């Protein structure tokens, strides 16, 4: 599976960065031709399921995901801490996992680590470098937009 690793720094506090990065509906708005369908009642928790549906018209594919780790950062009033969410991709077309981790920076702000490994059905390992490059571009752009003031 191609590995996608993105590190991004933000002036936002960890709790605010977390709030923005785990707003699943906003994720769909950042990826071209994609919308997110939340299938579990809020708030997000272990077991939450949602699907990113990408496509045009009747030509679409679904990327169903389940939250398997949900550890939000502590509120700033209790001393900022790291947060981690892990998603497992359970679709027919897209398989793998993704993690988003927020870490407080000593001088304020947050360092975000986005890690993802995915396999696209029908694409052999020869396409891994292309899939990884496209993923870094798309997810990096989505990350920056989600954190934008």
Regions flagged by a language model, labelled:
Residues 12, 45, 62, 137-141:
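Generic recognition of short, well-ordered alpha-helical interface segments
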Residues 117-149:
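A conserved amphipathic terminal alpha-helix motif
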Residues 4, 36-38, 51, 84, ...:
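Short structured motifs
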Residues 36-40, 49, 131-134:
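Juxtamembrane/interface motifs at transmembrane-helix termini
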Residues 43, 55-111, 117-120, 148:
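Hydrophobic-ligand binding "helix-grip"
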Residues 1-45:
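Hydrophobic ligand-binding cavity/cleft-lining segments
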Residues 17-21, 27, 50, 67, ...:
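Hydrophobic pocket/interface hotspot
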